[in-house]
Amino acid sequence: MDTPTLLAHLQTHDTPLTLPRGGTLRWDDADLHRAAHAAGPEHYALLALAPGALPWQRARVLLQTLAASQAGLDDATRDTLARLARVLTLALPPAHVITVLLALRRLRANHKHTTRTVLRFVLEHPDADALIAARRPALLDCFEHALGKTAARGCARRIDDGDTASDYLRRRLLRFLAVPAAAPARVQALYAAPPAATTGGLTGTGTAAGTGTAPGTATGPVRALPDEPALTLDPAREQPPTVTATNRGDIAATLVHLYRGGPAEDLYAALGRYVDDAARAYPRFAGTVALVLDASASMRGYGEREWAVLSQAAALRMLLSRVCDRLEVVEVGGDERAPRGATDLATGVLDALAAGPDLVAVVSDGYENRFPGDLARVAATLPRAGVTTPVVFCHALFTAADDLTLRRPAPSLPQRGFWHQDDFTTLLPWMFAHCPAGRPWLRAALHDRLDVLDRQAADLTTALAA
């Protein structure tokens, strides 16, 4: 499966995984995930970290990664998958992760990497005590599936007898953990009698002796399951109550002030800092991007919206100039400082292709008012003419709610909208995913993100040890 299609699926398909009692796992896109994993386990798994991927899709990636064998994978790939699984178990809502772990039990998937991930979630999650209190039966099932019922109960008996570091515990349990000292108390909590059953001790079934409680069934008060992830993958975006030309990101806001005649020296200095800060978040793209930049009169806008759309398009151009080894800009109509005239996007695309780029990106508000339909005809003709260079359409919007009914000049082209500087975090991976030169960039960007998240996960583990 091609990367853009998989990315779009991860960012739009929001159907939950469900596990009916006594039924089979309901996973409506399992074939798609299995095919993507088979094509490249590391690339597939890293895409779960792509900005904008949905929680239930990330849960599916976690499930597929843990369910699949790692036979034949090199050590570096195994390490990447292990770190990613650890990050996802902390960055997903706990209920999602518990569903994944129970699904692994239902699928009878139990590899060493699966065991390690399950045990570290059950015993080392920062909210493990609250999770066990709320979902003890489910987590007990996960624990016994990971170790095997006999080994799990053998460990529990030894811990109940005061053993914390015997060879038996090290070989069967503690070697899988990063903070072994936290395990005994939580194993005891897993096998503790339900709150309403206070007599008797631990039995071989994980129930309280002398009670009629079934294994894994709580009869005490229901505890609330923590619903917030311990690790944040995508920071929540604060939407302004009213969108204006100057609250759509620092780069665009500074450009608007410049276009309106503000103090140039101070504004240019600030602009450079803002672009540098934004570019620092991305690796270099070792290829050529040809940017068809719509600088027609409609991009300027009017009234309170004046310069809003063009400034955001210019912000994208400035960011790409810092990220790409080579950026060719083809302006259509006028130029950034003096937008004018009509929109001839088709000619702009043909001129851009003449530069021999790896990718052509059209940035426009979508109003094609010179030879309407030309861009669609050119887009349809290029493959027949043997042109294989990917062309994508980046919709410059005023807000995310813009009506694009009359603003799709080439419906066959891949399209994505952007209105705020924060949208660049999803726009750039989407753009570069369409060309072969973008695959190494995407891998580097996602590896960088994994490194940052893995350090944050390690900090959580360190806090647990303290």
Task: State what each model feature region is.
Residues A286-G287, M299-L327, E331:
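…and closely analogous acidic/polar surface helices at protein-protein or active-site interfaces
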